[in-house]
């Protein structure tokens, strides 16, 4: 089962907009306006298999700017497989995956990450001997624009003040909640 929950009650952010319905209202005509209509992430008629076992049958998902999507289901119901497809770690047998209206199926995982798609797994997988700063910068390893990386790091530290307070600490010394914040910030880098 897939549940979509719109963000409400959160301050506006460049990452998720302000969550108001007018963010998704039909825009005026024109190329830029038409581009605002399509979902940010789309899976269309995705079919995937593990050997003879079909993991997805015509899976359709749409995620618009300002939405949080939660994949819910029992063991072996395809949640992790869906994320692997979105991240480019697994190619579906058929169907489309679009990010910002462009297919990601021909892209490598680093190219998909550069487009701004990230994931925070249940297991945070930080590098415990590295500092928080070094862990965050690992989220931008595939990017060459140092100024943009520095700007993103600054934004993450503003978004997660507790992470900013711990920027020079080794990640392994942080509490579980602090480590989760670092993992989320790294995914947004």
Predicted feature residues:
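ABC-type ATPase nucleotide-binding domains, specifically the catalytic core motifs of the NBD
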Residues: 51, 69, 107, 132-151, ...
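Short beta-strand immediately N-terminal to the Walker A/P-loop
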Residues: 69-70, 119
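Conserved ABC ATPase signature
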Residues: 170-174, 178
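The feature captures the beta-strand-to-loop junction immediately N-terminal to the Walker
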Residues: 72-74
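Conserved ABC transporter NBD signature motif
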Residues: 95-103, 115, 148-153
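Helix-to-loop junction immediately C-terminal to a conserved catalytic motif
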Residues: 87
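ABC ATPase C-loop
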Residues: 187-188
């Amino acid at each position: 089962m897939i549940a979509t929950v719109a963000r409400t009650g959160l301050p506006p952010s460049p990452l998720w907009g302000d969550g108001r319905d007018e963010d998704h209202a039909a825009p005026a005509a024109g190329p830029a306006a038409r581009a605002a209509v399509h979902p940010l992430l789309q899976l269309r008629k995705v079919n995937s298999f593990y050997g003879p076992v079909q993991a997805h049958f015509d899976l359709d998902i749409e995620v618009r700017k300002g939405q949080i999507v939660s994949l819910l289901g029992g063991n072996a119901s395809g949640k992790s497989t869906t994320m692997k497809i979105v991240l480019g770690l697994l190619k579906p047998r058929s169907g489309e995956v679009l990010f910002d209206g462009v297919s990601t199926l021909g892209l490598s995982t680093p190219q998909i990450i550069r487009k701004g798609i990230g994931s925070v797994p249940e297991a945070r997988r930080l590098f415990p001997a590295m500092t928080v700063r070094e862990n965050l910068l690992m989220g931008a390893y595939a990017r060459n624009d140092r100024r943009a990386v520095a700007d993103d790091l600054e934004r993450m530290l503003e978004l997660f003040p507790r992470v900013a307070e711990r920027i020079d600490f080794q990640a392994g010394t942080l509490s579980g909640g602090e480590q989760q914040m670092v993992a989320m910030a790294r995914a947004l880098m």
